[in-house]
Amino acid sequence: MSTLRLKEAKVPSVQFVGDDDVLSHILDREGGTKLKKEKVQLLVNPQKVIKKAECELEKSDLEVLEDQNYVEVLGRNIQESLGNGSAVDGRNKVYSFQHRKHPEEMTKLALELAKTSGKIDPLASNDPKITKNIARKSKGHSSEKAPLENNNKNEFPSIQPHNVRKRLIASRSHCDSESEYSASSSEDDEEVAKDDEEDTNVVRCSKKSQGQNRLLPAPVSKEILPKKRKRDKAGDLVEEYFEAHSSSKVLTSDRTLQKLRRARVDQKTLRNLLSKFVPSFSTEIGQLNQQHERLFDKWILQLRLGFNIVLYGLGSKRDLLEKFRTTMLQDSIHVVINGFFPGISVKSILNSITEDVLSHMGTFQSVLDQRDWIMNRFKEDSSLELFLLIHNLDSQMLRGDNSQQILGQLSSLRNVYLIASIDHLNAPLMWDHAKQSLYNWLWYETTTYSPYTEETSYENSLLVKQSGSLPLSSLIHVLRSLTPNARGIFRLLMKYQLDNQDCPSYIGLSFQDFYQQCREAFLVNSDLTLRAQLTEFRDHKLIRTKKGTDGVEYLLIPVDSGTLADFLEKEEEEES
């Protein structure tokens, strides 16, 4: 029996001890003394964490993991105490701490937990103050503590909660400015008092950081605000663009140069004023003209050989051709044709040849008959020679196909010599291969840099009082681009105005009477067609409409009677 009792006494008894029993045992054995708080204990109260875990254990698994991590940290403290050489005397000294704590340890703990969990805060890693605190070592610790702590980091990984990391980051920037705690060898009561002061400082810093975090906006919102402003600004620009282009009306100013209140001078006065102006490069222009004048003998020879000469280049060539006429054609029969004149036509050119050169006073049925008679006369009499000098062969009055065809046929005669000038850039487009063979051109570049004084004397100018010559050229140019019915409508109105030109009370032709005349001539079939045609005339400023005292609309051509008579005569000549 004694041996059995001894064996039973030697058998150890096993009893389960929970975490609550361990903590209560620790508190009872310490006798109410305040435990030294390690790195995690600065932010986490063990009793509160355990009570919270007991109450909310069934709510979520994440809080259970936090309790387990806390226990792991407690186990870690055991190994730290062993590494520091602290005595563990049974269960009494398991959780006792023999080394001092410094303010930097809270930051170190946060960085260690962030590294072990694999989630490093980018703000903490980029802060130069944090790197400075990490590199600093406390005076009271031995040099062997660093490798042990590194090993413990790998041994006990823990997950740092988001709210704890946020508080650590916020408190770091405010607590660094506080005075550092200097280590010294003192008694236990002084260490406890200093630990209490550190706890109060940490709590104050955490409260300040929490209050400032509530007041200050997050840094992400500061980055978002400029983007929102840019988007709003871009949206405003888009809306302003569409608002500016939404209206279909185009606002243009009606203040033209014609409304300038300046007295207009006549052509002679303007010419006298321009003649007093001497250009600064007049010497060079004179030398250039002398080079062109040396070609006069060559031109005469080439004309005699059956070629015709065309001059092109920048500047007026009228003075150059006039010098050629006065020096080389004194003893020859020649005709000078001013193509820039608004009233010039092929009919007038042929009349000058038949009347002044051939001394024929008869009439011809058409322009073609007159052309044939002139050609036959020069072919029959080989002794007849004629020099034609045409200024601006590409003018609006001579650039027509019929005009160029007749002039080309005349220049193809052996005893008719043609020398002409062109100024338009696209003047060669007037001639096809057939006309080119008739003219048989020799091209000479004769740049003179002279002003186009005579050529532009008949053009519209705001400084010169104009006669009816310019409206005639404009009238012919516009009507040539219209349909035959449109020309017939305008001819009816023009004839009616010429018939009533001697009536002083004539204010125009009423619209109803004009519509009746157009219907009788089978030109229109409705008043809408006539109004559309009149709108085109009005756009070209060929007609003017006004209402009389009786409210009737009257039509009037704003051109003098002499110009209208010349235009009507030319139209009849071309039709015949």
UniProtKB/Swiss-Prot annotation:
It comes from the Eukaryota. The modification Phosphothreonine is found at T116. GO terms for cellular component: centrosome; chromatin; chromosome, telomeric region; heterochromatin; inner kinetochore; nuclear origin of replication recognition complex; nucleoplasm; nucleus. Transmembrane segments: none annotated. Residues 149-161 have a biased composition (Polar residues). One of its GO terms (biological process) is DNA replication initiation. Residues 119-218 are annotated as: Disordered. Involved in LRWD1-binding repeats lie at residues 1-100. Coiled coil: none annotated. Component of ORC, a complex composed of at least 6 subunits: ORC1, ORC2, ORC3, ORC4, ORC5 and ORC6. ORC is regulated in a cell-cycle dependent manner. It is sequentially assembled at the exit from anaphase of mitosis and disassembled as cells enter S phase. Interacts with DBF4. Interacts with MCM10. Interacts with LRWD1 throughout the cell cycle; this interaction, which occurs only with non-ubiquitinated form of LRWD1, prevents LRWD1 ubiquitination and hence stabilizes the protein. Interacts with POLQ. Component of the origin recognition complex (ORC) that binds origins of replication. DNA-binding is ATP-dependent. The specific DNA sequences that define origins of replication have not been identified yet. ORC is required to assemble the pre-replication complex necessary to initiate DNA replication. Binds histone H3 and H4 trimethylation marks H3K9me3, H3K20me3 and H4K27me3. Stabilizes LRWD1, by protecting it from ubiquitin-mediated proteasomal degradation. Also stabilizes ORC3. Belongs to the ORC2 family. Residues 186-200 have a biased composition (Acidic residues). This is Origin recognition complex subunit 2. GO terms for molecular function: DNA replication origin binding.
